[in-house]
Amino acid sequence: MTVCLVVIGRHVPQLKFLDVILGNEPVLTPVETFYQRILANNPEEATEQAEEFAKNSSLTEFFEEIAIPALARAQADSDRGVLPLEDRATFHSAIASMVENLLEDENATAAPEHTEGPIPQGLSGILAVAGRNELDEAAALLLVNVLRLERHIDIGAPLSADALSADAAHLPLFKEASVVCLSLISTSSPARARFLVRRIRRRAPRARILVGFWGSPAREVAAEEMARATSAQAVAVSLRDAVAAIDSMLSRERAPASVT
């Protein structure tokens, strides 16, 4: 009977837990555990997992090593048609709640650096926008909060993919931006990124554009080559790469013009 239940658990996604409980396969990896908690809309347990991880590392590393790979897996499942649209929305809302929980704890132990209330979108000149869906938006939210944690940059919440539609509601934000970060989970093609970069450039003609291909397995691919393929100023495949690229872009923005 046990063998039968294990076999069923391996082949019926809804009964996967039977294989985990009764089988002899290793327990879930940290990424799989996080994926399951977020999919179950359990940001509290996801928060606890992040806090436990950060005791020996940092929240940035948790976002990089656990959350981004989980989002990449979710996008792959969505591409295969096994992650319903409503689950994509759950991923975004649960990760947003987790980040809010984590930042509340961070702020409680640190001296206040900002006035209370929401950060005005575009205050820093940096704008983050999702390329396709809620998963890209969740990844953009992770980048935004890494910038807040590590660079103390006042940056508003990322815009949804709707901001790149024909609707002009967000045009003023783009026009004021000096850096625009386009967030895409790695399964997106350079051709799609190139199309979205063109849209951004029309909305933000003076901005430098960074494309984040989060969770990309091809880290050995030269960033310059990917940037050429997308017509962006920079491409990053990790949050730390993105922060370094934004540092470089901002330093160029602030550099005094040379005197001839």
Predicted regions mapped to residue ranges:
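Short hydrophobic/Thr-rich beta-strand motif most characteristic of the beta2 strand and flanking loop
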Residues: 154-161, 236
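Peripheral docking tails and interdomain loops at the edges
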Residues: 208-260
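Short helix-loop-beta junction
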Residues: 141-157, 202
